[in-house]
Amino acid sequence: MKPRWPRLLRRVAIAFALISAAASAADAPATSGGHFDLSRPEISRFLDELGAQGMDRAAAAATLAQAEPLPRIIESMSKPAEKTMAWWEYRAHFLTNERIEAGVRLWREHRELLDQVALRWHVEPQYVLAIVGVETYFGRTMGHYRVLDALATLAFDYPPRAEFFRSELAQFLLLTGEEQIDPLTAMGSYAGAMGASQFMPSSYRHFAVNEDASTQRNLWSDWGDIFASTANYLQLHGWRYGEPVLAEAQYSESAELALAASLSLSDTLGAVRARGVHVDSRLPDDTPCLLLGAPLQSGMSYRVGFNNFYVITRYNSSRLYAMAINDLAQALLERIHAQAAP
């Protein structure tokens, strides 16, 4: 989705002038005891690039001057759960009885809204809820870092992904002007993700939905916007309503497993079956898929991922994440059906 730059940038420049005026009188929280030196060459170039794109450079600099470098964010980047936990540990963390019950309560509370979202965006409620459940425990843990601090720290003090986070920082500055968000108080994760569904700024700008036609897209507290935006993201990345995410697989002693090395759907169901792997699915043999293996406390779990599995990895490019979303979604669906039964 291409932004309408001339009109947006005029609006953002005005918004930034107002925000920076207010920010000059505000007291930023003292978390690290220092601020970024805007004369650093990479920061100066960043501000120059914003100015060249039409943004008010002085207003952007006034906002960035309030950002504080947070070294602990760099530490957090090196140990995400997807890289430090085995599958069985990761799954157990997200599929507690308490989390499932919290999801069922939220489903009951917003059943009509979730049904409307499913009808419009063609994404089943359990998957929308599962993403919010894994990301923030259904809105309970949306992050305790200022987004400005997190993005600036990663943009200028984390060389491995500096280019990506500088882009996200620019997107955040644009977003705060468009949505009238105070850049000094917006809170999020250590990576700068925001709201109950943890959208990065670029995703917020391009995929967030104003479900109730209010004045802004609010992913922190407006459940209509949260559910609709999550479903919109999945739908625009190719979600297919009614199709499975995963299927269980078993193999014979002579089977050739050939586990997938990437997230691409480089196999077909027929080819996997031809190698001696039994897949519990009624999908046709020409269905694109990938064969997955994940360690349990004892032994291995084998599954086949389909199109909707791949779509979930567009939200977070981790196999463990996509499997956890599937399993939590199924647990929510089973629990709400069981509790509805006479």
Name every feature range the model reports, one short phrase each.
Residues P183, M187-Q297:
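Flexible, glycine-rich surface segments
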Residues G293-P342:
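C-terminal functional modules
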Residues E68-P69, E135-G139, A193, R240, ...:
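Solvent-exposed loop/turn segments at secondary-structure junctions
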Residues D27-A118:
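An acidic, Gly/Ser/Thr/Pro-rich helix-cap/linker signature
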Residues E89-S229, Q235:
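Acidic/His-rich structured neighborhood in mature extracellular/periplasmic domains
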